[in-house]
Design a protein with these regions (language model features):
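Bacterial Sec-dependent N-terminal signal peptides
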Residues: 1-21
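Short S/T/G/P-rich N-terminal loop/turn motif that feeds into the first structured element of a domain
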Residues: 18-102, 111-247
Length: 247
């Protein structure tokens, strides 16, 4: 009976993951306004996001800040990113507005954030294909985009790789790993396959980028297979720092 219950829990968890939909909203915040912007988000935004989670409107929320000095200067124009997760595509399609400072605090958003210069760069919607999480608290997260030769076979190899390193995640400081496919927009110049790797500290992030940390024991044959599936490598890899998030 215990084994049956465990199997049922596993299957239900897999169903939730297979339905999860999340949105990336990149933005550029004037560096002179960054400190004030982060203070406002931590003081007002996080609580509204937590209320939205408790009310079942969203599954999770985070604000990320791009780690500077890790790439070309011109690529650092987009320096912040909102992430909002929904438990299913249906929840995303029927989403309701919840970021309302006037309703929550009696202060209109245009007044509260009026002194912050923020320029948004659209919305990018993804479907989670697989993910592993544990009780560690991530401070940094790597976002990886790629154009696979064949998306299904690439995901199959990535599935085998992730299954092989899951047991090493916690001891190597990896709090989360995931794989997702892009739903919208459908532009051909945007990479359709997306991965994330979240760690407790920057040293672990650097180790991961050198194929160490949680992935150091992955079978080299599997890594070679992945390289074959991703002939052009990573289209983009960006390291972000968590500013604020729901639990």
């Amino acid at each position: 009976m215990k084994k049956i219950l465990s199997l049922c829990f596993l299957l239900s968890s897999l169903f939730v993951v297979s339905q999860q939909t999340f949105v990336l909203n990149p933005a550029m915040v004037n560096p002179e306004d960054a400190e004030n912007f982060e203070m406002l988000i931590k003081k007002y935004g996080k609580k509204m996001a937590e209320d939205a989670v408790n009310d079942g409107l969203i599954q999770g929320w985070a604000l990320l800040k791009r780690v500077p000095g890790m790439g070309k200067v011109e690529d650092e124009k987009i320096n912040y990113l909102w992430v909002v997760a929904y438990e299913s595509p249906k929840k995303y399609v029927n989403r309701q507005s919840w970021f309302n400072t006037e309703k929550k605090y009696g202060i209109p958003g245009e007044i509260l954030f009026g002194g912050v210069d923020v320029e948004r760069y659209g919305s990018f919607v993804y479907k989670t294909e697989k993910r592993y999480d544990n009780s560690l608290k991530a401070k940094f997260i790597i976002f990886n985009w790629t154009f696979p030769k064949n998306i299904n076979s690439a995901m199959n190899v990535a599935d085998k790789i992730s299954s092989s390193f899951q047991k090493d995640m916690k001891k190597e400081g990896m709090a989360s790993w995931g794989m997702a496919t892009r739903i919208i927009p459908q532009d051909s110049d945007l990479a359709p396959l997306f991965f994330w790797d979240a760690y407790e500290n920057m040293e672990q992030v650097i180790d991961h980028l050198m194929y160490k940390a949680a992935i150091k024991n992955v079978d080299q044959n599997l890594l070679s297979q992945l390289q074959e599936e991703l002939p052009d490598g990573w289209d983009s890899r960006i390291v972000w720092e968590f500013v604020s998030s729901t639990n």
